[in-house]
Structure formats: structure tokens, C-alpha cells
Amino acid sequence: MEYKHHALIARLVYKDLDKEVKKEFKALGYTTVKFFDIEGAQAYILANKDRITVAFRGTEPKEKSDIFADLEATHTNGFHTGFLEEYEKLQLSVHEEVAKLQGRKQRPVYVTGHSLGAAIASIFCFHYPEAVALYTYGCPRNASWKKAKELKVPHYRVVNNNDIVPKVPPAFFNFAHHGQLRYINYYGNIRELTTWQRIKDSWRGRRRAWQKGQVFDGVYDHLMDAYCECLEDNE
């Protein structure tokens, strides 16, 4: 249930706040909806009487800062420089809002995001270890091997079959994943597979994509709609 719930949120954060979006968040159980848009970086903070959810928006092709962030594959304080810069745009506002909500009533804080938003969500959790769980979808590597070991928040890293984004930046540039991999296989099911099993499953996915005329299978599998479709079938 949590995988699907946070996936729906991670998809919704690509929309700016309006009445319809507020209704969609309400349908997911949230009575408080806050939207932040700072220098091309966006986040939502959602709350109800039982929980707070912090969600970060992923890459938007129209946002030059998003593209530059993705390409800035150097390190700053153990983090991917581009992703860290996007997080820092939102850092003060998001942390202040979470503190304000917690000041009214203490609730568990969940964090989520897709693509670039997943990377920002990860960095947020390094700075907010009180979060109870981090759910990411198509998350790129965002920390050095040493820094990745320092994450205290339970991280459920969902990867859809041949999604290309979790493969970058390359590990040989000293970038690592963290958290527990939750792999969506060729059949659309969440499974824990060995490396060899994932390789075989990856080829099944490519073959299916070619049969459908989908040349860029890794790009299609990265779409948040593809994640939501698979997780809907898992319910």
C-alpha cells in the first residue's frame, strides 16, 4: 500500500497547485497541502492528523536548472553537486514548514520523489534523520560510497525493470546507491532478485519493448506513469 500511495504522490507533484490538484491530494487523505516553487525547484508538504509527507518534484525538460543539476556530476560534501544545489534551494522553507507542522502535533514524516525529485528527497533525509521512511522511484545515484553509508532513514528504492536513470551517474565516478532495492520485474511484480536474475529479467523487458516498437525501453520504464501502472497491478 505504501509503495502505491507514495508513487501517486510522486506523480502528482509534477503538477502545480490548483483546486483540482488539491482535490487529488484530498482523495489520498491529506487535509493540508503546501506548495513550494523556489528558483525552479519544487516540493509539496502534505499533512493530515496521522502523518506528514514531503514530496519533491523530478526533472522537467523546460526547467534549465533541472537539466544542469542532472549534468553536474561532481561531488560537494559527499553529495552530487547538482542535486545538492537543488535541495539547498528548498532546504530552509521545507525544514521550517515541517517544524511548524510538528510543533502543532507530532506525526511520522514520510519522504518521496521520482527521478531528480528522488535524489533531492534522499539528500533531505540525510539532513532530516527523524523521517520514518523514504520511498523513491527511479532514483539516480546521489552520494559518494562513504556518504551513502551514513543514511539513517529506512529507504525503499523502487526501480522499474530497465529504468535507465538509476544507472547514472556511473559508480566509477564514486557515486553509490543506498537503501533497500525494490525491483519491479518484467511481469510488473516487486521482487528481490539476484544480479543474474535481474540481468535475465532486463532482457525480457527489452524484448517486450522491441516487440511493441518501444526503442527506448529504459526511458519508458522511467516514466512515473509506468511505475504507477505496475504498482496498481501489485495491489
What is the meaning of each model-derived region?
Residues 1-112, 116-235:
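Non-catalytic, mobile gating and regulatory segments of ester bond hydrolases
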